[in-house]
């Protein structure tokens, strides 16, 4: 990629941000040297890695801090048999510990193929970690636990040092010696314990003079009684040094034996640091993975330049390459034209570097082989060239190298010279680039280019909207609408004499007046289209609310009807059973009476009556059973459109609107309502002839239930909040809302996490995300509901 283009599009500023976010030295070096790729497969692969990492971070939180140095030179030394120094060993130990921590962090990678493969490359060398931990406290301090021999040597050194200290303490407490000392203390020079002796009493304290004060008044003497002990300590110190060297060599050899797996783990950690750095940046910027293509298509939705403050950036929608290849943007200065150029160019560079873009899901970018940008006039200052010459030098280079796989971004094309010649030159350059198949976005002040864009095939106009009432740009990009200078309107609003304004209007050419009128008409049509779209969306929401309300009411009605039917059947059964019980008791009493009277004929007659009653009860019971079963078994054969039917669940008659599908579902119109029912829920209306009725179609619109678009649960416990959110989601779903917002605040994140865990299991929730700029960011969760 052209280095001038990278700088002009501020690509270097983004990778510098990522470099500072990365924790490991190798990852920082990666971002420092990162340049966009042109290989579609490599770019797609890198974006997929970042996508996995992004989703994992959202689900399981941020990863451990991967702060480590490049250990490859140290590993190479160990393989050659060299002894590593403590710092090198500790850095290798740090990598091994981070490998273990990352393996733990990546415990839930079953559905994340890339992260699962990375986890398998991370080693768990507890033996090496343990050996390093028991050896070093810091790079400069080796622990006694490093080896038993080292502990033994150091114990002897400490014992001898204590012996010297005891001897010296004994001397400074001796009144005979105290008068020879400058102070009754033990001083340290180098590693020696010494006494501060007055110079005039040099011969009174026998020993070796190791140092003296700046004035010469004090001599620092090691008494002879301590010299022999000091010599023993010196020997032990040498032994200590040799033992430490042996320990370092031992650990170096241990590392060398695992060199290959440590190297594999190191590379995995570096790659994880890189992709998670990109993922965390994407999370902070609310960025998304772009859809990539090689066919020259750009389609950005709500694109936000990452270097503009979140509360000030205005999202833009821009597309190129499908209906047109050259987009000419006109409009006032500081209206957002240059920002639009930079946004498109920067997003292409970020995408081709495997970095998400701050735009909505579904945004699409082409992988260009070349990207050129002529923005600003820095070269004119450095090289003492005019603005026009500096721009032209860049454009000459662009026209020489551009082809059908090139994106060209031109800011104020043709500026800095005579307007007529500049406009003519701009037309020729744009036409030339278009014929070469390049994709071009250019900004200009020249009105002639607006007409040129309307006349040329594969060209399109665009403008940055300007509010003439507030005299401020809105920064919205309007594709298909040429820009207006608004000079006369602005001047009039600012208070310029009306006579002057009208005089100026008279100097305008008829061509300019006609163009301004056409642009004004186009703007009016655009506003009307936006209003119609808004109305259509409102009607759509109302229709969805109607459908949801109807489905809910139908469900409630069917449930209640089934409950009543079952209750009636149960009551009928109870009556039959009760009657049977009472009759049985009655016959028992009559039988006893007949037996007492010894009337056989009466007894025989009673038995016959009993059997008649039993047959009657059985008949009634069978009728109840058949009545219940008939509601679910009776269906219609040879159903026809317009046929009159009875719908059991609604206890109403209607007409067939559509024939049953493969599952037996059909539409029936009852009055003004059209309902979806199953074939098992309808029956033929008896006594009807074969006449097919014509069904009048009517539209029904009801008002949406009064449900707020958001719910605030800040300050509530997780349990209380979830209960409220559950009820709210049911109401919102019933009302047909497509998107709602849950306000939980940032705080410690506990309430946010509890709500999100609940949302993952909720039957009405399609997806959810953090709020964007202006929505509340991480203090809210935006929920998309299912249809």
Curated annotation (Swiss-Prot):
Record-stated family: Belongs to the DNA mismatch repair MutS family. MutS2 subfamily.
Record-linked Pfam families: MSSS, MutS_V, Smr
Binding site for ATP: 331-338
GO process terms (BP): mismatch repair; negative regulation of DNA recombination; rescue of stalled ribosome
Keywords per UniProt: ATP-binding, DNA-binding, Endonuclease, Hydrolase, Nuclease, Nucleotide-binding, RNA-binding, rRNA-binding
Entries under InterPro entries matching the protein: DNA_mismatch_repair_MutS_C (IPR000432), DNA_mismatch_repair_MutS_core (IPR007696), DNA_mismatch_repair_MutS_sf (IPR036187), MSSS (IPR046893), MutS (IPR045076), MutS2 (IPR005747), P-loop_NTPase (IPR027417), Smr_dom (IPR002625)
Protein name: Endonuclease MutS2
Summary of subunit composition and partner proteins: Homodimer. Binds to stalled ribosomes, contacting rRNA.
Keyword Nucleotide-binding applies: yes
Keyword Signal: no
Source superkingdom: Bacteria
Organism encoding this protein: Caldicellulosiruptor bescii (strain ATCC BAA-1888 / DSM 6725 / KCTC 15123 / Z-1320)
């Amino acid at each position: 990629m052209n280095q001038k283009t990278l700088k002009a599009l501020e690509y270097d500023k983004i990778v510098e941000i990522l470099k500072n976010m990365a924790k490991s030295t190798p990852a920082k070096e990666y971002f420092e040297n990162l340049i966009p790729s042109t290989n579609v497969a490599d770019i797609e692969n890198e974006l997929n890695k970042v996508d996995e990492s992004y989703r994992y971070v959202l689900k399981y939180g941020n990863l451990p801090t991967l702060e480590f140095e490049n250990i490859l030179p140290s590993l190479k030394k160990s393989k050659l048999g060299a002894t590593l120094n403590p710092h090198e060993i500790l850095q290798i130990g740090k990598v091994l510990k981070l490998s273990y921590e990352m393996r733990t962090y990546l415990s839930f990678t079953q559905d994340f193929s890339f992260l699962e493969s990375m986890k398998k490359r991370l080693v768990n060398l507890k033996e090496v970690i343990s050996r390093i931990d028991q050896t070093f406290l810091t790079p400069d301090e080796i622990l006694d636990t490093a080896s038993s021999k080292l502990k033994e040597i150091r114990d002897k050194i400490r014992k001898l040092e204590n012996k010297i200290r005891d001897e010296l303490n004994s001397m400074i407490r001796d009144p005979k010696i105290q008068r020879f000392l400058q102070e009754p203390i033990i001083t340290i020079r180098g590693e020696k314990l010494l006494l501060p002796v007055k110079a005039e009493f040099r011969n009174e304290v026998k020993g070796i003079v190791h140092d003296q004060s700046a004035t010469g008044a004090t001599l620092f003497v090691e008494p002879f009684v301590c010299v022999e002990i000091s010599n023993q300590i010196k020997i032990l110190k040498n032994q200590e040094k040799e033992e430490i060297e042996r320990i370092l060599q031992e650990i170096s050899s241990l590392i060398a034996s695992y060199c290959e797996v440590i190297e594999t783990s190191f590379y995995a950690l570096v790659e994880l640091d890189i992709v998670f750095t990109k993922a965390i940046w994407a999370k902070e910027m609310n960025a998304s993975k772009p859809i990539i293509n090689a066919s020259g298509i750009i389609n950005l939705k709500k694109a936000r330049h990452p270097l503009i403050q979140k509360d000030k950036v205005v999202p833009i929608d821009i597309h190129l390459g499908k209906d047109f290849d050259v987009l000419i943007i006109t409009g006032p200065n500081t209206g957002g034209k240059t920002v639009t150029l930079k946004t498109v160019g920067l997003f292409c560079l970020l995408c081709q570097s495997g970095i998400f873009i701050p735009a909505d899901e579904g945004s699409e970018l082409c992988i260009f082989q070349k990207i050129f940008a002529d923005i600003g006039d820095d070269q004119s200052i450095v090289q003492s060239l005019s603005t026009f010459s500096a721009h032209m030098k860049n454009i000459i280079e662009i026209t020489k190298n551009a082809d059908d796989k090139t994106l060209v971004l031109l800011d104020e094309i043709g500026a800095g010279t005579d307007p007529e010649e500049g406009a003519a030159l701009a037309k020729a350059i744009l036409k030339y680039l278009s014929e070469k198949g390049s994709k071009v976005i250019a900004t200009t002040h020249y009105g002639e280019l607006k007409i040129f864009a309307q006349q040329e095939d594969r060209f399109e106009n665009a403008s940055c909207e300007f509010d003439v009432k507030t005299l401020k740009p809105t920064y919205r990009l309007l594709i298909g609408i040429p820009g207006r200078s608004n000079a006369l309107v602005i001047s009039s609003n600012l208070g310029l004499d009306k006579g002057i304004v009208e005089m100026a209007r008279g100097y305008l050419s008829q061509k300019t007046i006609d163009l301004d009128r056409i642009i004004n008409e186009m703007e009016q049509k655009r506003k009307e289209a936006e209003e119609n779209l808004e109305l259509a969306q409102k009607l759509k929401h109302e229709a969805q609310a109607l459908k949801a309300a109807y489905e809910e009411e139908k469900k409630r009605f069917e449930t209640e009807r089934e409950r009543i039917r079952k209750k009636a059947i149960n009551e009928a059964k109870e009556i039959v059973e009760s009657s049977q019980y009472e009759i049985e008791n009655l016959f028992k009493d009559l039988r006893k009476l007949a037996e007492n009277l010894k009337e056989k004929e009466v007894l025989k007659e009673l038995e016959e009556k009993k059997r008649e009653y039993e047959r009657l009860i059985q008949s009634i019971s069978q009728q109840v059973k058949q009545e219940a079963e008939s509601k679910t078994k009776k269906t219609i054969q040879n159903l026809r459109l317009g046929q009159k039917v009875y719908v059991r669940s609604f206890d109403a008659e209607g007409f067939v609107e559509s024939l049953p599908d493969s599952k037996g579902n059909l539409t029936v119109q009852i009055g003004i309502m059209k309902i979806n029912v199953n074939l098992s829920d309808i029956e033929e209306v008896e006594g009807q002839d074969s006449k097919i009725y014509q069904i009048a179609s009517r539209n029904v619109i009801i008002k949406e239930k009064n449900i707020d678009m958001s719910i605030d649960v800040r300050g509530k416990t997780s349990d209380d909040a979830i209960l409220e959110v559950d009820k709210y989601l049911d109401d919102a779903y019933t009302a047909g809302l497509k998107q709602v917002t849950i306000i939980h605040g940032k705080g410690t994140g506990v309430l946010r996490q509890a709500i999100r865990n609940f949302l993952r299991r909720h039957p009405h929730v399609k997806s959810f995300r953090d709020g964007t700029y202006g929505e509340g960011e991480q203090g809210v969760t935006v929920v998309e509901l299912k249809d």
